[in-house]
Amino acid sequence: MEAFIIFLISSTSIPLLSNSAFELFNMIPRCSVSWTSLKKLSLRFCELSDECIAKILSGCPILESLTLSHCIYLTVLDLSKSLRLRTLEIACNIDNTRPRQIVAPHIHRLRLKTYQSPCALVDVSSLDEAQVDCFIYSHLKTLDAYLLQDILKMLEKLQNAEKLIFGCNILQILSLAEVCGLPFPMFKTKALTLETDIFQYVIPGIERLLQNSPDLKTVTVRPSDGNIMPGRCFDNYLDLQGLNPNQCWRSKDGVFWNKSRSNLGSKRVTLFVELMLKNTKILDKMVVQLNEHYLRSKLKEFVPTFSQKNNVLIVLSTTLRL
């Protein structure tokens, strides 16, 4: 596999790269390429300068999907000349493996999981779908103030997307922004997915997201995939601001929520569903998938008489995720 990849990197024309996906792993591409039939490209653990990625992209004129995973040294990812590019995926878990800025006016789908601060979205004006989250090491004692502003700036660039997926860490940061009184943008999203468990550090952010999404038709809640920032980061930040964490994490109706994700009972699930109903206007469907690992009751006990609001279809299910 390594020899094959080196051959491709050193070749200027690869006519056999037609409709299949192609992946470069742990390489340092240095020359120009001419992959005129390539539609899907994945670069993982590569050393990429701005000039290098520009050369690669210029040699892929019909590229439709680009994945960058843990690629170092990239500063500005300029995709303005990739006219047919529709899907961009970026993942990293250390600071220098993400571009600082993204210029991608033609993409329709964005999947972004970055370390700490997100990439600055300079131009994503054609975006229809976005999935975003961030990774922060659990040993941190508090949150850096700049991260709140960076996340809110990113949200402004996602305002027109019809489908949004937010991870648990993003929701916790948004909750902190909400209790600190920072302004939120309005959204045109019609389908919102929240990848989170139910606990106090996500409630204020979820409330505000729902209130600021007046066109929302479908909301889906599914368990997070781990790597959750500890609550002390947010409590310590509030302490430094002179705020009382025990008061701040209440929902707007005064409910005190569970601090831990574990031991989730039927009462809290009912309150969560009611909270989402109260904060949406034209919702058609709500899907709540609960992590069976954190439940202290069986699903059959979670059949309360939810207040019906505009005949919203409510679906409850469980999954086992550690």
Swiss-Prot record:
Gene3D superfamilies: Ribonuclease Inhibitor. Disulfide bonds: none annotated. InterPro entries: F-box_plant (IPR044997), LRR_dom_sf (IPR032675), LRR_FXL15/At3g58940/PEG3-like (IPR055411). Pfam families: LRR_At5g56370. Residues 45-88 form the F-box domain. This is Probable F-box protein At1g60180. It comes from Arabidopsis thaliana.
